[in-house]
């Protein structure tokens, strides 16, 4: 990348979606390359021919979605994202399907995964961790106001836009929870005790995961680790924490209050909700209006040489386009897609 001359990046042009016909026509886009892979699909960088704007196109094979019993999860992701609008949540523009795949069109987050930056630097400074935690708190406050539990907060699901601000992505596990839900889902090291114990859970699980994330950002590893899932789960249920001497005292206090095994005692899950987290001493210097309005200067400004730069993503082998059509009974599961 050092051999390329840096260009001035033009502001993105908004693609206009007809609110009465927000279906995606895949033929309107040129596929550039793969920027992510999953169990039943890929994410491509694509360019809209008419506007020359770049987007991320998520393509999921219908046969794989059904065989892996992810039908409800993908429906839920599309349904939730279509009604969410927040500066720290990825924007979904539209969706479509054919006899092979489901498609979802997202804004292109050229900065890549927060996970990549954390692994490269091993740890984040106290101020860096606080910046990202503050943006996450704003997003969680918004989601929880709509009774939505995100349920999969981790560095791999947090991406940076070209300015360096954070965006929550991958809403496959997100769910509207009026009372409690019992489905066990998420990443083992980030699961809350009530999920593991199958006691029913709600939005409180996100505050637990935030505690795990802050700890990992500042130490480089999650607080509960083990060689087996049972070992990890046992440590989570016990909830014993170890901190390095250099761990900021206010950050330590916040993490301990977020990682309360008893969900009724967990910060963020009490009467004043997210406001309790926002008012914690670790965030004393944070102006929450500035956070919400993206006025704070991000600690990491992604290196980009053009709007379609993919230098902040891993390289992937491109797969062939030989696809198998889904049978009619599977296609019927997505008639309202």
Swiss-Prot record:
Domain of life, source organism:
Eukaryota
> Matching Pfam families, A to Z?
Pkinase
This entry's Gene Ontology molecular function terms read:
ATP binding; cAMP-dependent protein kinase activity; protein serine kinase activity
Q: What residue stretch is flagged as signal peptide? A: none
> Which InterPro entries does this entry report, sorted A to Z?
AGC-kinase_C, Kinase-like_dom_sf, Prot_kinase_dom, Protein_kinase_ATP_BS, Ser/Thr_kinase_AS
Matches recorded under PROSITE patterns: AGC_KINASE_CTER, PROTEIN_KINASE_ATP, PROTEIN_KINASE_DOM, PROTEIN_KINASE_ST
All copies of the Protein kinase domain together span: 29-283
- Where along the chain is ATP bound? 35-43, 58
Keywords, comma-separated and alphabetical? ATP-binding, cAMP, Kinase, Nucleotide-binding, Phosphoprotein, Serine/threonine-protein kinase, Transferase
SMART domains linked to this entry: S_TK_X (SM00133), S_TKc (SM00220)
The residues annotated as the active site are 152
Q: Which reactions fall under this protein's catalytic activity?
A: L-seryl-[protein] + ATP = O-phospho-L-seryl-[protein] + ADP + H(+); L-threonyl-[protein] + ATP = O-phospho-L-threonyl-[protein] + ADP + H(+)
EC number assigned by the record: 2.7.11.11
Q: Where do the AGC-kinase C-terminal domain residues begin and end?
A: 284-337
The record's Gene Ontology cellular component field reads: cAMP-dependent protein kinase complex; cytosol
**Family (UniProt):** Belongs to the protein kinase superfamily. AGC Ser/Thr protein kinase family. cAMP subfamily.
Q: How does it assemble?
A: Composed of two regulatory chains and two catalytic chains.
Q: What does this protein do?
A: Phosphorylates phosphofructokinase to activate it.
Q: What is this protein called?
A: cAMP-dependent protein kinase catalytic subunit
Tell me what organism the protein belongs to.
Ascaris suum
């Amino acid at each position: 990348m050092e051999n390329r001359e840096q260009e001035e990046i033009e502001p993105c042009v908004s693609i206009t979606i007809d609110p009465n016909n927000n279906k995606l026509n895949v033929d309107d886009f040129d596929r550039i390359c793969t920027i992510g892979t999953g169990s039943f699909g890929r994410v491509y960088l694509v360019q809209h021919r008419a506007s020359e704007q770049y987007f991320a196109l998520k393509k999921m094979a219908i046969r794989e979605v059904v065989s892996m019993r992810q039908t409800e999860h993908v429906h839920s992701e599309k349904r939730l994202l279509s009604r969410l609008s927040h500066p720290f949540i990825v924007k979904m523009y539209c969706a479509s399907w054919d006899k092979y795949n489901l498609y979802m069109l997202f804004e292109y987050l050229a900065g890549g995964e927060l996970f990549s930056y954390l692994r490269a630097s091993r740890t984040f400074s106290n101020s860096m961790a606080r910046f990202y935690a503050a943006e996450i708190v704003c997003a969680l406050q918004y989601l929880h106001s709509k009774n939505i539990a995100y349920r999969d907060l981790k560095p791999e699901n947090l991406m940076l836009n070209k300015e360096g601000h954070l965006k929550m992505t991958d809403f496959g596990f997100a769910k509207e929870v009026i009372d409690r839900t019992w489905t066990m889902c998420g990443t083992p090291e980030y699961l809350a005790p009530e999920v593991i114990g199958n006691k029913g859970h709600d939005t409180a699980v996100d505050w637990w995961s935030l505690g795990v994330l802050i700890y990992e950002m500042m130490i480089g590893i999650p607080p509960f680790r083990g060689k087996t899932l049972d070992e990890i789960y046992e440590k989570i249920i016990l909830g014993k924490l170890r901190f390095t001497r250099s761990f900021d005292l206010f950050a330590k206090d916040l993490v301990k209050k977020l990682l309360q095994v008893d969900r009724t005692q967990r910060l963020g899950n009490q009467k004043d909700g997210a406001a309790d987290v926002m008012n914690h001493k670790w965030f004393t210097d944070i102006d929450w209006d500035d956070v919400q309005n993206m006025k704070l200067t991000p600690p990491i400004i992604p290196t980009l040489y053009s709007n379609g730069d993919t230098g902040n993503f891993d390289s992937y082998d491109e797969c062939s386009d030989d696809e198998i059509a889904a049978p009619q009974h599977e296609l019927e599961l997505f008639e309202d897609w």
